[in-house]
Design a protein with these regions (language model features):
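Mixed-charge, low-complexity intrinsically disordered regions
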Residues: 1-33, 42, 47-107
Length: 107
């Protein structure tokens, strides 16, 4: 596993994932477990392959390889301020990530 700012050297991690062009199973944003490719350039979440935009994205840092929708993926913020201050986005925490999310924000 390549160690970078996104992966932190881990194969999987609880992350904030926001679809800038639509939704993720009914919501704009979710917090959940993501997995990383060996190179760390791709993120796998809810049967989606999200490739690093490499500076090509307008609103996101990743894009869906199949639909080309842009995504913003980042680490979970302890203050709970994961969304952009100027946006009103409903965020849901995946059931299997709730325990790890609580651990992160209470560190």
């Amino acid at each position: 596993m390549k160690n970078n700012q996104l992966t932190k050297g881990q194969n999987r991690r609880v992350m904030y994932v926001e679809n800038k062009d639509g939704d993720i199973d009914g919501l704009s944003a979710r917090i959940g477990w993501v997995e990383f490719s060996k190179s760390g350039r791709s993120v796998y979440y809810r049967d989606r392959t999200l490739k690093r935009a490499g500076g090509q994205g307008i609103r996101g840092n990743h894009y869906d390889e199949e639909t080309r929708e842009e995504y913003w993926i980042s680490g979970v913020k302890k203050r709970g301020t994961n969304t952009h201050w100027a946006e009103s986005v409903e965020v849901s925490i995946d059931e299997d990530a709730k325990e790890e999310y609580q651990r992160i924000i209470n560190e």
